[in-house]
């Protein structure tokens, strides 16, 4: 515990120091735990307990003057406190051997070194942002969630991809991505970068959206070089929104796809928006052919204000959907049904002058057909 004064990594003789704390670290109001601003060293701090900062915690005081922090141990722990400076160079979460142990951020402030390609590394356990902060995890680098890891937003905003992002700045999903509330952004809205969620052919890739917002500037898809890979997708809560912008997309994969043995598509609430289309019947924008599915609510929306004029979406679903809506904001859109007949458990809503084309496939609607387009019916 630092009650007053300064506890400092000195960088003496440019030599790194490694400290392991098996209990908690507490920094009181007015106290400081930092790295010296002279000398250069990549120090290390391993914490098995909680980090409570009510003063100043600064592990990145300049180029080469850093302390990288590892949170370890199999128990749930927190980063909390009211200090205005809780500054990390990098954080590694290595808690236990599964995703069960949680490192939860509840502090008033927290920042990472945004000049690095990737500043948060998940090895084992869950990293959860509960504080209403904006946290940038990567700049140019991709971010990997391993099989035994979970990235979770519970009130804060997590960004993957910064000013130096490229098409390769993706979220590589082997484990779990979870949004309870708050936001997770993969890529920056408005950029023409294919920043994807790429789920692997191994591991147990899973997306859970129980509130808040998930934005993906590219696609949610398999690896482009092999056909294996199965995703478990669960969306609930009417306030939740998933937006797939589909920018600069790879046409060897759909904008949003769930298929193969072990895959799941479960939806009981919220909105799933596909903004962009390949606009080509040879390429499918929505491809749902999961191994299992439970659908009791939610709305799949084709198009948004970002969709170019005259676009046609191509949709495939072997499982029932609850609500389907075709957007007409700014301009009209067209949706073409492909391969399978479709069951819509509740409503099909066609806004403005948009068009839904069944292309000879049967459609069963359990609720209402709301067609605002009086000039076209196909």
Positions of the model-derived regions?
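Extracellular beta-sheet-rich ligand-binding/adhesion modules
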Residues: 1-378
């Amino acid at each position: 515990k630092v009650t007053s004064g300064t506890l400092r990594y000195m960088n003496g003789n440019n030599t790194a120091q490694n400290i392991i704390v098996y209990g908690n670290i507490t920094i009181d109001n007015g106290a400081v735990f930092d790295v010296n601003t002279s000398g250069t060293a990549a120090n290390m701090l391993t914490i098995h307990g909680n980090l409570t900062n009510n003063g100043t915690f600064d592990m990145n005081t300049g180029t080469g003057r850093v302390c990288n922090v590892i949170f370890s141990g199999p128990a749930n722990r927190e980063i909390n406190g009211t200090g205005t400076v809780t500054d990390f160079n990098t954080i590694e979460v290595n808690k236990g051997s599964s995703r069960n142990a949680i490192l939860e951020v509840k502090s008033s402030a927290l920042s990472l070194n945004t000049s690095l390609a990737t500043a948060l590394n998940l090895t084992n356990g869950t990293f959860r942002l509960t504080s209403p902060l904006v946290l940038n995890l990567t700049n140019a680098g991709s971010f990997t969630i391993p099989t035994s890891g979970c990235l979770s937003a519970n009130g804060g905003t997590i960004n993957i991809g910064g000013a130096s992002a490229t098409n390769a700045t993706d979220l590589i999903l082997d484990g779990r991505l979870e949004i309870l509330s708050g936001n997770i952004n993969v890529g920056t809205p408005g950029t023409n970068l294919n920043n994807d969620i790429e789920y692997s052919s191994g591991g147990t890739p899973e997306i859970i959206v129980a509130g808040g917002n998930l934005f993906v500037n590219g696609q949610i898809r398999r690896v482009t070089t092999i056909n294996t890979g199965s995703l478990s997708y669960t969306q609930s809560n009417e306030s939740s929104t998933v937006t797939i912008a589909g920018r600069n997309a790879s046409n060897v994969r759909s904008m949003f796809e769930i298929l193969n043995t072990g895959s799941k598509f479960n939806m009981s609430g919220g909105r799933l928006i596909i903004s962009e289309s390949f606009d080509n019947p040879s390429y499918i924008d929505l491809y749902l052919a999961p191994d299992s599915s439970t659908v009791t609510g939610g709305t799949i929306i084709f198009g948004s204000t970002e969709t170019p004029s005259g676009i046609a979406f191509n949709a495939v679903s072997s499982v029932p959907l609850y609500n389907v809506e075709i957007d007409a904001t700014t301009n009209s859109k067209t949706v073409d049904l492909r391969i399978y007949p479709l069951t819509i458990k509740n409503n099909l809503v066609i806004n403005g002058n948009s068009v839904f084309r069944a292309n000879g496939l049967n459609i069963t609607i359990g609720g209402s057909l709301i067609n605002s387009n009086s000039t076209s019916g196909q």
